[in-house]
Amino acid sequence: MGGWSIALHGGAGDIPFSLPPERRKPREEGLRHCLQIGVEALKAQKPPLDVVELVVRELENIEHFNAGIGSVLTNSGTVEMEASIMDGNTMKCGAVSGLSTVLNPISLARLVMDKTPHIYLAFQGAQDFAKQQGVETVDSSHLITAENVERLKLAIEANRVQVDYSQYNYPEPVKDDAEKELPLTNGDSQIGTVGCVAVDSHGNLASATSTGGLVNKMVGRIGDTPLIGAGTYANELCAVSATGKGEEIIRATVARDVAALMEFKGLSLKEAADFVIHERTPKGTVGLIAVSAAGEIAMPFNTTGMFRACATEDGYSEIAIWPTT
């Protein structure tokens, strides 16, 4: 086995190269801060499952990302958060969705995994379970930012839903019942879904993903993030967290497909991840982060950019948004 490795993302999408520093730097600093937390935890020999939960909790607490505080709003102006976590060693996993008051959805997903015979709890049942477990909750208004209220207003006016990091262009006419991405004003970039994957020096793997979903999504809409095999997956070969257009990720079972290509076709992590992103999903829709049991890292995307960061035990680290080659 190789040494430990970790990767995290803050969402993929049409991130304009002209993204102003005041929009870019807080997200880069957030990734740097969370990467350091993950690195220190791995150096302290914490289990990868604990590491990915810890890192995603920190990402949820940063309002510049679309998870926890700063989650985007439904078409009713409410927050509906979702998350999932998976341990590659045991294949145990937990998922939640429809959360409106839980401060850290990823930790509730972990409790579903550890404290129930189930994998997935949603809406009122998940909220009730959070109360039973003493999970920290807040008034839903605490999770709503002025920026996201404005995003929802723009989305409703344009009759569109919007995924992570959509660039602003003047809205074109929208056909009835058509679903298009919402543009944003001033070249801004939409805050993004967050995720983390990690492997320790013994090859134990884990993955975690958390999001607020789509701007102006229908109440009750569930995306890829809480779906094991779509937005999140881990086994003895690799750990994967996906980001982008949830419906496309679900159709392609993105996270599981990476593992399946490694298992059944003998592909390397990079080969499998690149194939899924560039051959199995439409251009401009999806990105992912992945680590293998040997400590390899892959962070492909077919969008303009993806907020991402990674580090390995041998000292390599990277924080990037756009393609680096």
Curated annotation (Swiss-Prot):
Give the EC number(s) listed in the UniProt record.
3.4.19.5
Instruction: Describe the PTM.
Output: Cleaved into an alpha and beta chain by autocatalysis; this activates the enzyme. The N-terminal residue of the beta subunit is responsible for the nucleophile hydrolase activity.
Quote the tissue specificity entry: Expressed in ripening seeds and developing nodules.
* InterPro entries from the UniProt entry: Ntn_hydrolases_N, Peptidase_T2
- One MF annotation (Gene Ontology) recorded for this entry: hydrolase activity, acting on carbon-nitrogen (but not peptide) bonds, in linear amides
GO biological process terms, semicolon-separated = proteolysis
Q: Which domain of life is it from?
A: Eukaryota
Write out the catalytic residues in the record: T193 (nucleophile)
The residues annotated as site (Cleavage) are: G192, T193
Q: What class of enzyme is it?
A: hydrolase
So what does this thing catalyse?
Cleavage of a beta-linked Asp residue from the N-terminus of a polypeptide
Gene3D superfamilies membership: (Glycosyl)asparaginase
State where substrate binds: R221, I222, G223, D224, T243, G244, K245, G246
Q: Which UniProt keywords apply?
A: Autocatalytic cleavage, Hydrolase, Protease
Record Pfam families: Asparaginase_2
What does the subunit section of this Swiss-Prot or TrEMBL entry state? Heterotetramer of two alpha and two beta chains arranged as a dimer of alpha/beta heterodimers.
What functional role does this protein have?
A: Degrades proteins damaged by L-isoaspartyl residue formation (also known as beta-Asp residues). Also has L-asparaginase activity, which is used to liberate stored nitrogen during seed development.
Query: Family, per the entry?
Result: Belongs to the Ntn-hydrolase family.
* Name used for this protein in its record: Isoaspartyl peptidase/L-asparaginase
Species assigned in the record = Lupinus luteus
The lineage is: Eukaryota, Viridiplantae, Streptophyta, Embryophyta, Tracheophyta
